[in-house]
From Swiss-Prot:
Annotated source species: Squash leaf curl virus (SLCV)
Protein's recorded name: Capsid protein
Zinc finger regions, unnamed: 63-80
Similarity section: Belongs to the geminiviridae capsid protein family.
GO molecular function: DNA binding; structural molecule activity; zinc ion binding
Superkingdom, taxonomy of origin: Viruses
């Protein structure tokens, strides 16, 4: 039941002093209680069940934070025969760049850098396309297979490369792209920028070893294959490859 206002509330020049009033000189400095903010940031046990069972889109299913990162910075000499590197090499440890246990999930891959030619090659009149394949190896063993062992090509041309039929159950091309450079005296484009960001959600499994090597993978290794289309003029790629991953709950 609502109380009526006291008569002195209606009298001019007078006011009732509230018991909850704060006359401290630091009153304006402290944080004020916001009812709406407290409701939004309420603890998980006071939320409905769907909030406890559903996970945000940032964290993959079966994983937990924080989001960790591993970088691979290297200059690559890319030839017509192709090159491969493993980008899921993560050492076991306690840091922000290490995995906690055997299992983790690579949420996304970020590739940035440039493709360029040296002083002798860029003077020749030619066009060279550098092609990249992000491949998932479902059953890694030993050392990474070479470009020619994994891909089937017509007339040894990397632009026609597809996974061999007997390896399609093991290797899966997740993404592919290319960058083009042109040499010559006039209409030359001696370097090309590379910038790609992919969401992959690849669950990697290691064995009991701590070292981050391809030979210690047991499931779902991430490989980056590179090859150029020109047979006699190689190119260089200065790349910084970053993977963002989460540790698995089952570790």
């Amino acid at each position: 039941m609502v109380k009526r206002d006291a008569p002195w509330r209606l009298m001019a020049g007078t006011s009732k002093v509230s018991r909850s009033a704060n006359f401290s000189p630091r009153e304006g400095m402290g944080p004020k209680f916001n009812k709406a903010a407290a409701w939004v940031n309420r603890p998980m046990y006071r939320k409905p069940r769907i909030y406890r069972t559903m996970r945000g889109p940032d964290i993959p299913k079966g994983c937990e934070g924080p989001c960790k990162v591993q970088s691979y910075e290297q200059r690559h000499d890319i030839s017509h025969l192709g090159k491969v590197m493993c980008i899921s090499d993560v050492t076991r440890g306690n840091g922000i760049t290490h995995r906690v246990g055997k299992r983790f999930c690579v949420k996304s891959v970020y590739i940035l850098g440039k493709i360029w030619m040296d002083e002798n090659i860029k003077l020749k009149n030619h066009t060279n396309s550098v092609m990249f394949w992000l491949v998932r190896d479902r059953r890694p063993y030993g050392t990474p297979m070479d470009f020619g062992q994994v891909f089937n090509m017509f007339d040894n041309e990397p632009s026609t490369a597809t996974i061999k039929n007997d390896l399609r159950d093991r290797y899966q091309v997740m993404h592919r792209f290319y960058a083009k450079v042109t040499g010559g005296q006039y209409a030359s484009n001696e370097q090309a920028l590379v910038r790609r960001f992919w969401k992959v959600n690849n669950h990697v499994v290691y064995n009991h070893q701590e070292a981050g090597k391809y030979e210690n993978h047991t499931e779902n290794a991430l490989l980056l294959y590179m090859a150029c289309t020109h047979a006699s003029n190689p190119v260089y790629a200065t790349l910084k490859i970053r993977i963002y991953f989460y540790d698995s709950i089952t570790n």
